[in-house]
Design a protein with these regions (language model features):
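Positively charged n-region of N-terminal signal peptides that target proteins for export
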Residues: 1-12
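C-terminal motif of bacterial Sec signal peptides marking the signal peptidase cleavage site
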Residues: 13-18
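Bacterial Sec-exported substrate-binding components of ABC uptake systems
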Residues: 19-110, 220-248, 372-388
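A short, structured surface patch at a secondary-structure boundary
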Residues: 70, 76-161, 167-174
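Extracytoplasmic ligand-binding site segments that recognize negatively charged/polar headgroups
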Residues: 100, 108-114, 125-136, 176-179, ...
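Structural recognition of the beta-strand scaffold that forms the well-ordered cores
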Residues: 101-104, 121-125, 167-171, 191-194, ...
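Structured C-terminal subdomain patch of bacterial secreted/periplasmic proteins
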Residues: 199-231, 308-388
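Flexible, glycine-rich surface segments
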Residues: 238-323
Length: 388
């Protein structure tokens, strides 16, 4: 252990010295250069079929390899006991199976991994046990099957290296600390930055399960799971709107109201469920954020007459009563939905349960189609609870 600690200390000193001499460069936003496959030992044979996802692509290549492209990053997934092709372009990161002792920083990636029964591949977490809302992930950490290895900006390099980490799965927050990504790669740990949160279609977000199927040899399971989830909401697709208007929001501590943009996946789920999103013209304002903060006056003007209010507990905490809601924002007492008792609150697990979006769509459909809030059978709801 002392030799390992000394080695890690030396490696860290060398790595940080390198960082001082070579500052991290900004992440390029240009599309990736194509590999010169005429000089490599593999060829692209066909495109892996994806129906909805736009933020990643997969090419099926010779020798059973898969070439994954996520924005401007490329990853070649090589089967176990297979030789890595020669002549690869320098921008391609090799992921040699089996991928074990994964350092999982992106919380939205845990749910698809759990659904594929691939949790044993994850032994390191960037989220502490108390911040997991997925019972299996929380229990695995409490039982010592998964160790906390530091958040995205401050990983425990010694723990990660000593665990023989085979892959770090990050989200785009890592680009705020590019030196961390660089350090992990200097230790020989490939870093995959997933972008499922940039998908504007709920089905596209769920289709990322296919990427994890490729990484963890669960392709058939991923296809089956995804198709089953799509079938659950297919009866709702193409149906006429219920005419119910809805708002998905939360109130910040500094008296602003956070709502989803009109092109966001939550707004699209409201439409799939038969509702009409109140902020249908709230388009992009030049950043990649899915939300926007409105003043109380702006929110009041547009949302006062909404039929249904859905409070997002994942940001500012859960509310159970109208009194709690009004303590956050007294002016909501004037709102039609508050006066009619048609206010609902999400569970705090909502965004970590990234593969259960059909349940939220079905929950909202039950609310939108009910004759009154009291007619909704709450035992049938997974993500929504009635604010009494």
């Amino acid at each position: 252990m002392r030799r390992l600690t000394a080695l890690l200390a030396a490696l860290l000193l060398l790595a940080f010295t390198g960082c001082a001499a070579n500052p991290a460069q900004p992440e390029s936003t240009s599309s990736p250069a194509q590999a010169d496959e005429t000089q490599a030992d593999f060829q692209v044979e066909s495109a892996y079929p994806l129906e909805y996802a736009k933020e990643f692509t997969v090419d099926e290549c010779t020798g059973g390899t898969r070439l994954i492209t996520i924005q401007n990053a490329r990853y070649l997934v090589v089967p176990e006991n297979s030789t890595v092709p020669n002549g690869l372009s320098e921008d391609i990161t090799v992921l040699q199976k089996p991928l074990e002792n994964v350092y999982l920083v992106s919380t939205s990636a845990m749910d698809p991994i759990l659904k594929l029964d691939a949790r044993s591949a994850v032994t390191l977490s960037g989220t502490s046990a108390e911040n997991w809302y997925l019972p299996e992930a929380k229990e695995a950490m409490e039982n010592g099957e998964i160790s906390y290895a530091g958040k995205y900006s401050a990983p425990d390099y010694e723990r990660i290296v000593s665990a023989n980490c085979g892959l770090a799965i990050e989200n785009t927050m890592i680009y705020h600390t590019p030196e961390v990504k660089e350090q992990l790669e200097k230790f020989g740990i490939p870093v995959l930055v997933e972008r499922s949160s940039y998908e504007s279609d709920p089905l596209a977000r769920m289709e990322w399960v296919k990427l994890y199927g490729i990484l963890f040899d669960k392709e058939a399971e991923a296809e089956t799971f995804f198709n089953e989830q799509v079938q659950r909401i297919r009866p709702l697709l193409g149906q006429d709107t219920t005419g119910k208007t809805a708002v998905f929001f939360s109130v910040t501590s500094n008296n602003l109201v956070t709502v989803r943009k009109s092109n966001d996946y939550v707004a699209k789920m409201i439409g799939m469920a038969g509702g009409e999103y109140v902020f249908s013209d709230l388009s992009d304002n030049g950043n990649n954020l899915a939300t926007i903060n409105l003043s109380l006056e702006e929110f009041y003007a547009d949302a006062k007459d909404a039929d249904v209010l859905i409070y997002n507990s994942t940001i500012e905490g859960k509310i159970e009563t109208t009194e709690q809601l009004l303590s956050k924002c007294p002016m909501l007492a004037d709102f039609k939905a508050v006066q009619n008792g048609n206010v609902w609150c999400t569970t705090q697990s909502l965004f970590q349960e990234s593969m259960e979006l059909p349940d939220l769509i079905l929950d909202m459909n039950r609310v939108f189609t009910a004759e009154s809030p009291n007619a909704v059978n709450e035992d049938e709801l997974k993500f929504l609870t009635h604010v009494s």
